[in-house]
Amino acid sequence: MSQNTSLVQENYKDYTSQVNVKKTVQILLNYVPPEDLAHLQSIVLTNTAALSRKRKRQRRSSGAPLSRVLGRCYQRWKGQPAYIELYVDNILEDVSWYDLRLPMFRNWMFAKILYHEIGHHVQVISNAKLVKEEVFAEKYAARLKKRFSRQRYGYLRRFLLPLIKVCLGFIRIIKLVKKRLVRKK
């Protein structure tokens, strides 16, 4: 945990998050294999207002303006270490209050983005050039999110699966009753 504490930095300009994003990211990093974080200097939590004017106008390779993206992975270049930026204001922009208040949903929301960006970093350090960048990052994020969910919330599987089966049973019964009522008319 101490290694991950120094890895996460906050750099906001005139912005205060409604939740402790740093703590959320630190929790998520505990489920990342240490070798996948090799050569990664920091994970910077920031907002788009903290971007310079020049960087706000920059575009991603997909054509999206940098001011609209959720995260970005910067690789080692000209002696500068690799780091990841997460744009917290963009991530939380359309999120409902109950998604923020429930740690499980908040963790899943940030896990998808953080693990995706770490996936870009892992692809570079592992020289996995055969797979397209976004495909590799998405698969990596899905694998780590699944691992995180099973280890952190595994106890819910024993509770939720039977509950879902019961709910689906009720839904089938309701549909059958509706069909019979429609036939009688």
Task: Name the predicted role of every residue range.
Residues 132-147:
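An active-site-proximal "capping" alpha-helix that borders the catalytic cofactor pocket
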Residues 21, 111, 133:
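Hydrophobic (often cysteine-bearing) scaffold residues that line and stabilize catalytic clefts
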Residues 92-113, 128-129:
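Short pre-active-site segment immediately N-terminal to the catalytic Zn-binding motif
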Residues 2-7, 19-22, 148-185:
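Long, well-structured alpha-helical subdomains associated
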Residues 112-125, 137:
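Active-site recognition of the HExxH zinc-binding catalytic motif
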Residues 124-135, 152-156:
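Short conserved catalytic/interaction loops centered on acidic-Pro-aromatic/His motifs
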Residues 88-90:
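Short, small-residue-rich loop/turn micro-motifs
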Residues 1-85, 95-102, 181:
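A metal-dependent hydrolase signature that marks the N-terminal structural subdomain at the beginning
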